[in-house]
Amino acid sequence: MGRILAIDYGRKRTGLAVTDPLKIIPGGLTTVPTHTLLDFLRDYVSREPVERFVLGLPRRMNYEESESMTYIRPFAVKLAQAFPSIPITYVDERFTSRMAQRTILEAGIGKMKRRDKALVDEVSAVIILQSYLDNPDR
């Protein structure tokens, strides 16, 4: 039984979150420099079984894809080629960064740590993963 791994893909950094082995509880995994992401995922998947990737899909308020898709789409192709046996599900990621910032603030995290963009990316990935877990039959 594999985990589900969520990806909040960014140009510089990518936040990652993963479920527990029973696929009930999402948790932050890490944030990695985007240029090392595929290598990180290869290493992680070699150690931990992953049964699905959940990739944040940036959309505008009118549900059209945002301009960020110009760099996310090529990554999704590379991800599918690198892991042909692991399906990819796309989840709407609108407002995840704002939600992550609010969550960090409400958790009482100190001001300096709240400015850490890597933490925001990781928490955003957790929110994307929770969104998938709430509605896996999308």
UniProtKB/Swiss-Prot annotation:
Cross-referenced HAMAP family: Nuclease_YqgF (MF_00651)
Top class in the EC scheme: hydrolase
Keyword Nuclease among record annotations: yes
GO BP terms, alphabetized: rRNA 5'-end processing
Name of the featured protein: Putative pre-16S rRNA nuclease
Record flagged with keyword Hydrolase: yes
Function: Could be a nuclease involved in processing of the 5'-end of pre-16S rRNA.
Domain of life per record: Bacteria
Entry's transmembrane regions: none
Listed CDD domains: YqgF
Subcellular location: Cytoplasm
A single MF term (Gene Ontology): nuclease activity
GO CC, one annotated term: cytosol
